Every structure is written in structure tokens, then in C-alpha cells.
């Protein structure tokens, strides 16, 4: 048992040495440029020199913005004229017409219960239009059953 383990360890070490040799950079390849560290006590040298760095909002700034939004929400409940959300709500609740994007009601909801019972007994359905009633066949086709 110990012999098997020692053979496996030797194989792993052999593979590792081959891998290390393979991954070593050759003398012909150029490596990354060396990093130059300049130590200084100046405050300006401690600032990042990247122009792409964007300062993040601090936690107190975020809390202040949240508090301001809460205050404006409270003002809207007091003065509904100034609140845009309230005016939009009134616009849709006062207008009796449905928006054009709304799906129309299905006809089975508009048909009275008495007519529906009659359709179930006879098995024939009629649809009313301006000309009168038009037979459509069985109620199964309309989905009334």
C-alpha cells in the first residue's frame, strides 16, 4: 500500500516539475515592466493618478437623498396639486373611458345567466349584432360551456 502511494507521489512531483519548466518564461520573452514604487509623505502623491477613478457616494450622502425623497413624498400627501403621481392617478380615475391598450371583455361575461342557461339546454348559441341574432352552432365553439 505504501509503495502505491509513493509511486503516485513521484508521478505528481514529476508532472509538477515538467509543468514548472513549461511555465517558466524564456529568456527571449519580455515580462511586464517592473513596478516602480515611490514613497513620499506628500498628500498629493497619495491620491490616485488615474483620471478614470470616479468618487463613490458616501453613506451619509445616500442617507440624505433617501431622507429628502421621504420628505417630498410626505409633502405630496399634504398638497396633492404639487405631486405628479397624484395628478396621474386622478387623470385615470376621473376618466371613465378605458385606455386604448386595454383588452376588451369576453362576450361570455356580457351574456346574462338566463341566456346562458338556455344555450346549455338547446345546445345552440346566438350572437346579437345590429341585424339581429345569428346562429353560431354549439356553445362549445364559443367556450360558453
Swiss-Prot record:
InterPro entries: BCOR (IPR031628), BCOR-like (IPR047144). Coiled coil: none annotated. Residues 1-58 are annotated as: Disordered. Residues 38-52 have a biased composition (Polar residues). Residues 1-27 have a biased composition (Basic and acidic residues). Belongs to the BCOR family. This is Putative BCoR-like protein 2. It comes from Homo sapiens (Human).
Amino acid at each position: 500500500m505504501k509503495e502505491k502511494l509513493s509511486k503516485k507521489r513521484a508521478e505528481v512531483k514529476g508532472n509538477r516539475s515538467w509543468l514548472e519548466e513549461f511555465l517558466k518564461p524564456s529568456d527571449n520573452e519580455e515580462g511586464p515592466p517592473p513596478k516602480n514604487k515611490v514613497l513620499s509623505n506628500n498628500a498629493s502623491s497619495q491620491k490616485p493618478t488615474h483620471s478614470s477613478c470616479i468618487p463613490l457616494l458616501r453613506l451619509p450622502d445616500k442617507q440624505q437623498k433617501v431622507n429628502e425623497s421621504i420628505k417630498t413624498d410626505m409633502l405630496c400627501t399634504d398638497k396633492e396639486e404639487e405631486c405628479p403621481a397624484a395628478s396621474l392617478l386622478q387623470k385615470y380615475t376621473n376618466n371613465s373611458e378605458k385606455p386604448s391598450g386595454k383588452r376588451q371583455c369576453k362576450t361570455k361575461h356580457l351574456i346574462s345567466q338566463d341566456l346562458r342557461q338556455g344555450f346549455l339546454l338547446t345546445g345552440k348559441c346566438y350572437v346579437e349584432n345590429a341585424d339581429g341574432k345569428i346562429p353560431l352552432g354549439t356553445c362549445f365553439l364559443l367556450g360558453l360551456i
